[in-house]
Amino acid sequence: MMPRIVSSAALCAIAVLVAACASAPPSRFYTLSRTATPGAAPATFSVVVGPVAIPAVVDLPQIVVSTGPNQVTLEEYNRWASPLANNISRVVAENLVDLLGTHRVSLFQQSIPVDGDFRVAIEVQTFDSAPGDAATLNAVWVVRRARDGKSDTGRTTVREATADKSYEALAAAHSRAVYRMSQDIAGAVRALSRATP
């Protein structure tokens, strides 16, 4: 009698687990995207983007939603398709290709070391997500000229409204915020390319 009770309990537990898995919504994955359009005057210099540092609280696969001044929610079914720091550096590099008119833009994380005429380092201090409201980015960045170490440090603070309450609209708003930062960085690169030692 005891084995039959145990096996019935096990079957019930398995049935509950299967039902829970079957009812869970599918995960959705998002990326940031390039926003710039070609058209900048061509440049011949090269740029290396990275490293990019982000706050530990958002350095997660889940999209982290700000729900109050001291509270966040992890969106289990709405996730970034790749690590957020890599996502940001990739999109900044793609934007700089268009904004600077050069294809000689590479990522610091590449396995093959690349020496660029300029190095861009970014420290993201705020990366807030509020679906149906806005995406907020606050970042400090440094552009350093390789030949003499001359540098320019700047800060980009931007709040981009979302088009609707969807996470796709949130990712698009974050992409626009990263584009605004890319514009600031491109301006600093161009200024340093013209500056005398």
Each predicted region: which residue ranges?
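Sec-dependent bacterial lipoprotein signal peptides
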Residues: M1-C21
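A structural "domain/chain start" motif
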Residues: C21-A85, L192-P197
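Surface-exposed short loop/turn segments
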Residues: A22-A43, L99-R147, T162
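C-terminal/domain-edge helix-coil "capping" segments
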Residues: A22-F29, T37, L99-L100, T162-P197
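Generic beta-structure capping elements
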Residues: G50-V52, I63-G68, V140-V142, A146, ...
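Short secondary-structure boundary motifs at beta->alpha junctions and helix caps
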Residues: V72-A81, R147-D184
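Mid-chain, structured segments of secreted extracytoplasmic proteins
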Residues: L74-R104
